[in-house]
C-alpha cells in the first residue's frame, strides 16, 4: 500500500473521497513519519477538509526539517493567504521562488496576491519572471496588462493585452479589458473591432455585448447600441449596469422617456441602492415633470 499510495490517493480525491484520502495518508505517516511527500499531501487534504490551522502545522513540520521544500512553502503560503496573513503568505511564496525560480505556478500565485494587495510594482516583477521563462504565457501577459490598466498606464496595458490575445485568442477576459483600455484612449472604432472579433468565439458572453453597446453609443449609433444591450439582457437579465446603459440610450439618444424609465426601474428592482440607476431615474423624472404642460395650457390649449 505504501509504495502505491499516490495512485490510491489520486483515485480517492478524483471521486471526492477526502475522508478516505485523510485516512490513507494518516496511516502512511503512522508507518513512516519521515515521508515528506505524504506529509505535504496530508496538509493539502487537511486544507480541503476545512482544517487550515492543522494543515499549516503539517507544512510547518515539513519545513522544520526541510526549510527549502517548495511544495511545503507553497502550501503554507496558500493557507496564510486564506487566513488573511498576507505578509507571511508573500514571504513563503518568495522563499519558494528563491528555491525554485523556474516554478511558474508559484510566481503566478504570488503575483495574483500582490495585485490583490495593490502592490502592482512587485506583482509586475512576478509577471516578468514568468515571461522570462515563457514569453508566450498568455495568462502572465494578461495579468501584467490588467495591472497596468488599474494604474492607468493604458499604452502599456494595450500592448500587454494584445500579446495575451496573440498567444491565446480564446481569452475573453483579455478581450474585454482591451476593449476598456481602447475606450479609455478614445479608440472606439478599434475597440469595436476587438469586440466583434471576440464575439465570434464568445457569442453568449453578455459582457461583450454590453461593451459593444457602450462603444456604439460612444460612436453615436444608438439604435445599434440598443440592439447590443438587448442582446446582453437576453443572455443575462440580472446585470444592473446593462439596464442603466439601455435606459440611458433610450432617454438621451432616442427620446423614449417611458421606455427609459422602465429600464431604470428594472435596474432598481435588482439593486435598489445602485446609485447610477437612482440618479438617472431622479433626473429623468425631473425632466418628465418639467415637460408636462402647465395647468393653464391644459385648460386653454
Residue ranges of predicted features:
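Helix-start (N-cap) detector for alpha-helical repeat units in TPR-like alpha-solenoids
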Residues: 2, 36-37, 70-71, 104-105, ...
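Residue-level recognition of tetratricopeptide repeat
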Residues: 10, 44, 78, 112, ...
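Register position in tetratricopeptide repeats
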Residues: 14, 48-49, 82-83, 116-117, ...
